[in-house]
Amino acid sequence: MKATQIIQGDDKHKLILLEERFARCVDFHKKYNTEKKFETRIYYPVKLAYENYHWQDILKKLLPKGIEIPGGYETVGDIAHMNLSDEQMPYKNVIGKAILDKNTQLRTVVTKIGKIEATYRFYSLECIAGEPKYDTIQVEDKVRIGLDVSTVYWSSKLSTERTRMVTDFIKDGEVLCDMFCGVGPLVMRATAKRPKMRALANDLNP
């Protein structure tokens, strides 16, 4: 639930929702009256429903005691990419549905199965919620990259490193040789930003 709520019929003010333990604290109230210029304090009843809870809070209610709540997932386009443990796998569909329900921009939730053993270094995946489709569009720095997460290796965590290389190292007029390019995110981003450069890209995975 958002901590800031609109006030019907009042465009100049908003409600800031605090936990009751903070709202009852005189020192806290005085401090934020001064720093944030709160005008008044009221009690605001809140009716909590499924849509008000974060997906992890929902799983805390649904999963058996002792089962670890997933810490997060990687987003690739409109696909949530998870790495569930053996103890979490029996509840994979519950976990996937909670994530899908709370993230309307997502279409599919998948989890890795086993280790990387394929020649082309991609994971075996299982769809645990949503559409069983693995093709998606990942956008990095306004560049649209099409990929199938079931047939290629992809890591969104490398986006920061690609940004650093394109910004700090690759210059106009140079030749970029990426011999292990994957689906080519570095080459595509570099040539989009620096049209006067040349690029050579290759990967074992056709």
Task: Give residue spans per PLM region.
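SAM-dependent transferase fold signal centered on methyltransferase-like domains
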Residues: 1-206
